[in-house]
Amino acid sequence: RRAQKKSPFVRTTGLRRTRLDCSTSGPVLEVDHLIASGCLIPMDMLARVGRMREDFFIDFVDVEWCLRARFEGHPVYGVCTARLEHRLGDEPVKFLGREYLTHSPRRHYFHVRNAVLLYREPWVPLNWKLVSASRLVLKMGFHVLVTPPRLQHLARIASGFLHGLLGRTGAAPD
């Protein structure tokens, strides 16, 4: 069983993604996005911003909604005292003495496809796109080089990239 680890709240400023520290901040922080399963969203906010995109299927659903809400002038806040137990990823892979979170090749398809779909949106801030894209390239490059089955990861990542460019949504093709 993996060790319990706190995921930080993050905020992109300029070309930096900063992990926000609850121990040195107030109890509530303005953030880029939150995990959807841990969100409390008033119904009137859903009416104003719209629902979360079901066509994304999985991955970036919450990020897209939070960025859209922020674009429309509604800040997104993380509450430092809130706790959500949530397992992310599959079994970690060890590399150079450290453990790294992994996902299946299928999950990487959605991650890349939905990221590319989000980068195509004109209302997503350019600095956020640049920071996210650079992190995505590093993360997916790592999985292609280190996480077995490497060729399946490469194929699904490439397919996700192409489908994102083509604007395809919904469930992944088999």
Where are these regions (language model features)?
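Acidic/His-rich active-site region of diverse nucleotide-sugar glycosyltransferases
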Residues: 1-51
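A structural signal for well-ordered alpha-helical scaffolds and beta->alpha junctions
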Residues: 3, 15-16, 108, 112, ...
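Extended, non-globular alpha-helical segments
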Residues: 21-42, 94-133, 158
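A short, conserved alpha-helix in the catalytic core of glycosyltransferases
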Residues: 38-39, 44-50, 55-82
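Short glycine-enriched, charge-decorated loop/helix-capping segments at active-site entrances
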Residues: 55, 99-102, 147
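Short glycine/serine- and small hydrophobic-enriched flexible loop segments
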Residues: 68-71, 117-120, 143
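Active-site donor/metal-binding and catalytic loop motifs
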Residues: 79-99
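Non-catalytic, C-terminal membrane-associated alpha-helical segments of glycosyltransferases
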Residues: 121-174
